[in-house]
Amino acid sequence: HTNFAYAYAKRMLEVQSRAYKIQHGLNYNCVTPTNIYGKYDNFNLESSHVVPALIHKCYIALVEDTPFVVWGSGNPLREFIYAPDVAKLSVWALDHPEHSNMILSPGQEVSIKELVFEIAEAMDFDGEVIFDETKPDGQFRKPTSSMLKHVLPDFKFTPLEKGVTETVDWFVKEYGNCKK
């Protein structure tokens, strides 16, 4: 299963917004975040993105005292952004139409393996972690533009450790109520 249509749609935002400006004089602000994670996310194992899915899988492994099994080698690299950072940057983008097409990313690639161990630590999971290399890794890298760092060099992104810990704490507390 692939997300090529989702990725393509994100790329088309910029093209469409430019076309509206040229043809109709309309200004649109398109912000395209990398992998968003945080409280209130969709933690459903069938339909969630990587961070909430891994948090949910780790929680199940913890509660059931089973290994935390992760698809693939853990080597692919991704960029993650905490939802409150996306909110702050989106509000900023509305006030700065000169930066109408911006990829929201801390500009730091993290391996899936690093993410898995960050989640396991935040969850206090000390069981076995298995990377099932019979399952696909997906694309190795999905690099993004670092234009945001040039435009807002002083913006302080939430460190992955802090964002993951806050998300894990919320998920555990709200397990009975959250979307899963």
List the predicted regions and their residue ranges.
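Active-site "substrate specificity/gating" loop of NAD(P)-dependent dehydrogenases
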Residues: 1, 42, 46, 73
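Active-site Tyr-X1-5-Lys
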Residues: 1-34, 50-64
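Structured catalytic cores of enzymes that bind and process phosphorylated ligands/cofactors
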Residues: 8-13, 22, 38, 83, ...
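Short, conserved glycine- and acidic-residue-centered signature motifs
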Residues: 9, 47, 141
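Active-site loop/turn elements of alpha/beta-hydrolase fold enzymes
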Residues: 33-36, 73
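Short beta-loop-alpha junction of Rossmann-like oxidoreductase domains
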Residues: 39-42, 147
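Short acidic-hydrophobic sequence patches enriched in Asp/Glu that either
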Residues: 46, 50, 111
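C-terminal substrate-binding subdomain of Rossmann-fold SDR/epimerase-dehydratase oxidoreductases
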Residues: 60-180
